[in-house]
């Protein structure tokens, strides 16, 4: 069974607070051709923002998002890219619905 997201990278930025998360999301989507797939309120004020796209674009987007987040105080907790998430990871991402979004 073919998976349309195979070969598509996943970029994640975790922040301390909503304002750095919004700043990171804005910078990521402006910096490269990526799709913002959502955000997750992790708890304790932590927010994770996720993007998908080609590996190079996601890499550039996550760098830009992390830089932007750092300019908003000490909001950056972590930034990470998974170049080709294994197909078993995809169900954990869902359709974006667990992120509070609807298709």
Curated annotation (Swiss-Prot):
SUPFAM superfamilies per UniProt: CcmK-like
Give the intrachain disulfide bonds: none
Q: Which residues form the BMC domain?
A: 9-94
Q: What induces it?
A: Transcribed during light cycle, reaching a peak after 6 hours of illumination, mRNA becomes undetectable during the dark. Part of the csoS1-ccbL-ccbS operon.
Query: Carries keyword Transport?
Result: no
**Keywords in alphabetical order:** Bacterial microcompartment, Carbon dioxide fixation, Carboxysome, Photosynthesis
Tell me how this protein assembles: Homohexamer with a small central pore. Forms a CsoS2-CsoS1-RuBisCO complex.
What does the protein in this record do? Answer: One of shell proteins of the carboxysome, a polyhedral inclusion where RuBisCO (ribulose bisphosphate carboxylase, ccbL-ccbS) is sequestered. Assembles into hexamers which make sheets that form the facets of the polyhedral carboxysome.
Q: What PANTHER family does UniProt report for this protein, alphabetically? A: BACTERIAL MICROCOMPARTMENT SHELL PROTEIN PDUJ (PTHR33941:SF11), PROPANEDIOL UTILIZATION PROTEIN PDUA (PTHR33941)
Q: What is this protein called?
A: Carboxysome shell protein CsoS1
Q: Which organism is it from?
A: Synechococcus sp. (strain WH7803)
């Amino acid at each position: 069974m073919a998976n349309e997201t195979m070969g598509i990278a996943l970029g994640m930025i975790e922040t301390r607070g909503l304002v750095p998360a919004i700043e990171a999301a804005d910078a990521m989507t402006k910096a490269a051709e990526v799709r913002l797939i959502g955000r997750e309120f992790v708890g304790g004020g932590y927010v994770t923002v996720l993007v998908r796209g080609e590996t190079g674009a996601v890499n550039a987007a996550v760098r830009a998002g992390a830089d932007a987040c750092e300019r908003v105080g000490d909001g950056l907790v972590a930034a990470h890219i998974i170049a080709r998430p294994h197909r078993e990871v995809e169900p954990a991402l869902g359709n974006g619905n667990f992120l509070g979004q609807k298709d």
